[in-house]
Swiss-Prot record:
Glycans are attached at N76, N373. GO terms for cellular component: membrane. The chain crosses the membrane at residues 8-28. Its cofactor is heme. It comes from Hypoxylon pulicicidum. This is Cytochrome P450 monooxygenase nodR. It comes from the Eukaryota. Cytochrome P450 monooxygenase; part of the gene cluster that mediates the biosynthesis of the indole diterpenes nodulisporic acids (NA). Nodulisporic acid A (NAA) and its chemically modified derivatives are of particular significance because of their highly potent insecticidal activity against blood-feeding arthropods and lack of observable adverse effects on mammals, in particular the tremogenicity associated with the paspaline-derived IDTs is not observed. One of its GO terms (molecular function) is heme binding. Belongs to the cytochrome P450 family. It is found in: Membrane. Keywords: Glycoprotein, Heme, Iron, Membrane, Metal-binding, Monooxygenase, Oxidoreductase, Transmembrane, Transmembrane helix. It is a single-pass membrane protein.
Amino acid sequence: MFDIDFGILFPISWEQSPIFLAVGLIFAFATLSPWLRSGERLINGREGFEILWTNAKKRYQTKGRSVMEAGFSKYNDSFYMMTDSGTEMVLHPRYVDEIRNDPRLDFHRYMKTKGGEINRDLIQTKLTRSVGRLIGSISAEIEDALHNRWEEGEGEYEEYLLVLPPAEMHTEWHEIVLLSVMIPVVAQGVSKMFVGDPLCRNKDWIGMILRHTRSVQTALRSLRLWPYFLRPLAARFLPTCRQVTAEIEEARRIINPVLEKKRAEKLAMIQKGEKPPEPNTYMDWLEESDKDEFYDPVVAQLKISMAAIHATSDLLSQTIFSLCDSPELVKELRAEAVSVIGAYGWGKEAIYNLKLMDSVLKETQRLKPMQINLTRLALDRIKLSDGTVIPRGSKVLISCHNMWDSNVYPNANQYDGHRFYKLRQRAGMENSAQLSTPSPDHLGFGLGMYACPGRHIASTVMKVTLCHILLKYDFELAEGCTPRVIEYGSFLLADPTARVSIRRRKEEIQL
């Protein structure tokens, strides 16, 4: 899922900023430390008469993939790169097996998150195991959201729909800005698992988490251009960061009454000698978890919602863009959905047996992963098998460019929706070629001890959503529209402006 540096936004304290250091010493450290650490192996330094690293960071933000490609063309194994997070050591993907489970390379410390281990455990041991019994409920939310957003033009994103009377929107072709209309659909679907009823259909909650996702991304873009030691101070005054803080308080006003009601009902049942209902949502399991000083149920909900909604909507939208160029593949996917859902209904068996759909999603993610590297912080000095040294305290990026290597995947630059479906037919690859199974050759969901804990949930939500879209809508790219891949630093994002024409069709089976 989407990696977000929450540590500089939630929470912010004056103690984080070394305000008592002399200004001259700070300035010297900020300007010289990247060069001192990386030496000649810094691939993208300052240019001309630049003193600070701000412009180098901006160049990385707009050309991150090109900078990384230039680094590997000059240095085969490792080099340093100035990113918007500072100087980072970049490693070739051949090292991924060495670092995947090394506890000295820490993802949470890189992201500066607190309580991440608790959230990961809850997602893996509680939420993922409950998905099977929630699939029918998730489907109902997706169905409701698609009807309201794609057909009725309801809600915050109605400006992204071609204006038509609601009746005609059921039968006539009309345009949508796909990503912008996909986001609230996914938000309602995942909220069923995260907060449950009634919040999953609460327009204030859905609208708030959508706005908050945009606000956090905007705040981080501006904040990362500041020297690290000044970020806590800048976050106090930048309007974008103040907006994030205001939205957290708005989230508290929405969630806290629901939490208080749940707590009161549970206490009343216990006092009567009755057994409270079993936890059924992420919110419930957070309440049941061992809480520490970092426990904040509202911030926890915002974090998981942002990560899940953004990444899932992005991959779904990119998949639809790819399918617009493959009408025969669309027919095959529809036939598979009719066959599988008709045979199994909504359950784990259905999700597992949507094998072509699984392959299509995995191939889309292979060609356009949301992030082109894995991230870690070195807690100690580490010497790799070939003698390469990772200095203690280094931020480390492991490149994912092997996913586009024709030595790994034949015709790697071509989209082949059947690629992983065929691989699953090979002996011993039934599981390894699945979307939710990371491997050294496919790092879309990370790898090892820090692989995305919500990947099984994301896979389920995407398959349910695609089934509804495929069976209920005809779709094609809007006239004159060619979706782009938006590059931002290490991220590859689906085109947020690309338009798709859709029309309601009669589904072959009831979902």
